[in-house]
Regions:
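Detector for outer-membrane/organellar transmembrane beta-barrel domains
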Residues: 82, 111-129, 134-210
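Outer-membrane beta-barrel "beta-signal"
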Residues: 253-269
Length: 269
């Protein structure tokens, strides 16, 4: 487990500071279990993604969050300094690379009518400040707005719109070795979700659908969990990826669609 130091102090804004002594990447698809799209091959590949040690940062990560409640609205300002959590960049030899990343943003959550509304904004500032290096992700502006409410007893629904804007897009396309596979200048994703509880809340049904009109792809996820006692639980579900193009965010994983089932028994300590 990673060691994280935290500090906090109460004043006009509450402050939370986190320091990760050494960069910790996310677990992503690397060809071990699912294939992914490789623009250099112009097709999906199941070859294991190998990241050389020199392309793996060992420097610290820093994160800070300032937050408070104002007139029923939870406001937060946050920042991060570290590296991309997935190896989205490449070195001059085409090998995967974690590039520098600084993120600043804010969020707001408050009751809206019978439900809860949320708003988020973030600016991703990377190494490629003018878009001329196609091996490094461009700076991005990200925006999210969502709403969730209980429709009837035990049935909750939510909707969300998320967008990414790639800065200096024309410059990137002009310098790219494979412009036909580059992400769009503006990517939109609409998310809908339903959550239903039954049988005295021992049965939980959960459905998500992520759909991108700009990429014309999406991801449908369904999960059912039944926990009649504290001793055991059975669950099952489906992950369905769909899309017309093999290089888009969800479309590249179409062949990775799956169904699953699990049983858990909890032993007394």
């Amino acid at each position: 487990p990673a060691e994280i130091s935290k500090g906090g102090k109460d004043f006009e804004f509450e402050v939370s500071v986190e320091v990760m002594p050494e960069f910790e990447p996310d677990n992503g698809i690397n060809g071990e279990y699912f294939s992914y799209f490789n623009p250099m091959l112009a097709e999906n590949t199941g070859a294991r993604m190998v990241i050389p040690d020199e392309n793996k940062p060992d420097d610290p990560e820093y994160a800070m969050r300032l937050y408070r409640s104002v007139a029923g609205t939870e406001l937060a300002i946050y920042g991060y300094k570290g590296f991309t959590k997935l190896p989205e960049a490449a070195d001059e030899l085409g090998r995967p690379l974690y590039s520098d990343l600084t993120v600043t943003g804010f969020s707001a959550i408050r009751p809206v009518g019978p439900g809860i509304g949320k708003l988020e904004y973030a600016f991703h500032d990377g190494d490629d400040t003018d878009g001329s290096n196609p091996l490094i992700p461009n700076d991005q502006t990200r925006f999210l707005i969502g709403y969730e409410q209980e429709l009837v007893a035990n049935l909750t629904a939510g909707v969300q719109w998320y967008t990414e804007f790639n800065h200096d897009f024309d410059v990137r396309i002009a310098n790219s070795s494979w412009p036909q596979f580059e992400a769009t200048e503006r990517r939109h994703v609409f998310t809908t979700q339903l959550r239903y509880q039954a049988l005295q809340q021992t049965l939980v049904l959960h459905a998500f659908n992520f759909w991108s009109p700009t990429d014309d792809d999406g991801f449908l996820r369904f999960r059912a969990t039944y926990s009649p006692t504290d001793k055991w639980q059975v669950s099952g579900g489906m992950n369905l990826f769909y899309g017309d193009e093999a290089h888009t965010f969800y479309g590249q994983f179409e062949d990775a669609s799956n169904v699953y089932a699990s049983f858990r028994y909890f032993f007394e300590g």
